[in-house]
C-alpha cells in the first residue's frame, strides 16, 4: 500500500513544485515505484520541472471526469525508471475537485505505487484541502521569511484538523523543509535562522536546501537538479534518504564559523 506524501506550503513561490519533482526522482532512483501528482489546478508547472510538458495528453481532471482511464493519463518518465507523472489541468477551475473523486483517484494509485507525491496548491488557495485529505506524510516547504512562516503555521493547523488521518485520531507525519537558505545572510542577522524557524513552527526538520543558481538553470532546461552534483542536489538526495527512514547527518554549508554548530546541537 502506497504512502501518500503531500508537499505543501503556506504561500506560493517557495519551491514546492521543485521539491516535489526532485524528491520524486530521488525516491524512484532508490528503487521505489513513484507517481508524482500535480494538484495545482490551473497553475501547473511540475510538468516543466520534470521535462514532461510535451507529453501531456490527459490530466488529473480528465481522469476524475472519466474522459479517460488512469493508465491513459499517467506519463512514464523515460529518464527515470519507476517514475510516473499525472499532470494538473491548466484550464479547469480548481473547484472542480471533490472529495469523492479525489478518494477514487488516490485509492487507484495506492494499488500500484510505493509512494504518491502530491504537489499541493499553496495553503491559502482553493484545492489545498483536497491535496492534504489523504496524506500520510506532509512536507511543509518554507523559506526563512516572516510571511512564509506565518502562512505555513496556518497550513499545519488545517492539516491537523481536516486530513482523513486527523479525523480518525491519527497523526499526519509532518516535516519541515527549509528552502533557499543563505547562510551568509543568517550569519549577518539578515535572514531568520534555522533555529528560529524550528521554534516558530515546532515541526521536525527533514532537510535544508541552500540557495543555488543551479536550480534555476535546471528548471529552465527541464532537467531536475537532483541529477546534477551541486549542493542543492545533494540536499535533495539527503531528504530522500530521510524519507526512506535513514539517519542522515545534517551537513555544514559555507558560512561564518559557528553558525551550523548550533544546528548540530539541535540534533545531537
Curated annotation (Swiss-Prot):
SUPFAM superfamilies: P-loop containing nucleoside triphosphate hydrolases (SSF52540). One of its GO terms (molecular function) is ATP binding. Keywords: ATP-binding, Cell cycle, Cell division, Cell membrane, Membrane, Nucleotide-binding, Septation. It is a peripheral membrane protein. One of its GO terms (biological process) is division septum assembly. InterPro entries: AAA_dom, MinD, MinD_FleN, P-loop_NTPase, ParA/MinD_ATPase. Its main location: membrane. GO terms for cellular component: cytoplasmic side of plasma membrane; cytosol. ATP binds at residues 11-18. It is found in: Cell membrane. NCBIfam families: minD_bact. Belongs to the ParA family. MinD subfamily. Interacts with MinC and FtsZ. ATPase required for the correct placement of the division site. Cell division inhibitors MinC and MinD act in concert to form an inhibitor capable of blocking formation of the polar Z ring septums. Rapidly oscillates between the poles of the cell to destabilize FtsZ filaments that have formed before they mature into polar Z rings. This is Septum site-determining protein MinD. It comes from Helicobacter pylori (strain ATCC 700392 / 26695) (Campylobacter pylori). The lineage of its organism: Bacteria, Pseudomonadati, Campylobacterota, Epsilonproteobacteria, Campylobacterales.
Amino acid at each position: 500500500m502506497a504512502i501518500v506524501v503531500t508537499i505543501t506550503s503556506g504561500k506560493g513561490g517557495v519551491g514546492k513544485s521543485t521539491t516535489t519533482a526532485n524528491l520524486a526522482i530521488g525516491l524512484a532512483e532508490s528503487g521505489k515505484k513513484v507517481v508524482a501528482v500535480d494538484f495545482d489546478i490551473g497553475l501547473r508547472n511540475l510538468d516543466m520541472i520534470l521535462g514532461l510538458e510535451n507529453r501531456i495528453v490527459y490530466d488529473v481532471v480528465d481522469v476524475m471526469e472519466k474522459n479517460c482511464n488512469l493508465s491513459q493519463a499517467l506519463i512514464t518518465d523515460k529518464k527515470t525508471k519507476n517514475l510516473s507523472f499525472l499532470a494538473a489541468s491548466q484550464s479547469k477551475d480548481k473547484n472542480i475537485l471533490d472529495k469523492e473523486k479525489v478518494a477514487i483517484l488516490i485509492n487507484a494509485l495506492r494499488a500500484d505505487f510505493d509512494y504518491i507525491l502530491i504537489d499541493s496548491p499553496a495553503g491559502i488557495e482553493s484545492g489545498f484541502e483536497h491535496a492534504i485529505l489523504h496524506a500520510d506524510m506532509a512536507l511543509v516547504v518554507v523559506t526563512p521569511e516572516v510571511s512564509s512562516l506565518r502562512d505555513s503555521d496556518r497550513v499545519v493547523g488545517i492539516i491537523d484538523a481536516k486530513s482523513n488521518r486527523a479525523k480518525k485520531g491519527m497523526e499526519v507525519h509532518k516535516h519541515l523543509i527549509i528552502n533557499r537558505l543563505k547562510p551568509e545572510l543568517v550569519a549577518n542577522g539578515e535572514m531568520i535562522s534555522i533555529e528560529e524557524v524550528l521554534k516558530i513552527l515546532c515541526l521536525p526538520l527533514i532537510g535544508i536546501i541552500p540557495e543555488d543558481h543551479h536550480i534555476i538553470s535546471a528548471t529552465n532546461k527541464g532537467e531536475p537538479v537532483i541529477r546534477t552534483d551541486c549542493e542543492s542536489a545533494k540536499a535533495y538526495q539527503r531528504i530522500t534518504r530521510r524519507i526512506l527512514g535513514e539517519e542522515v547527518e545534517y551537513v555544514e554549508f559555507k558560512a561564518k564559523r559557528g553558525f551550523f554548530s548550533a544546528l548540530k546541537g539541535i540534533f545531537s
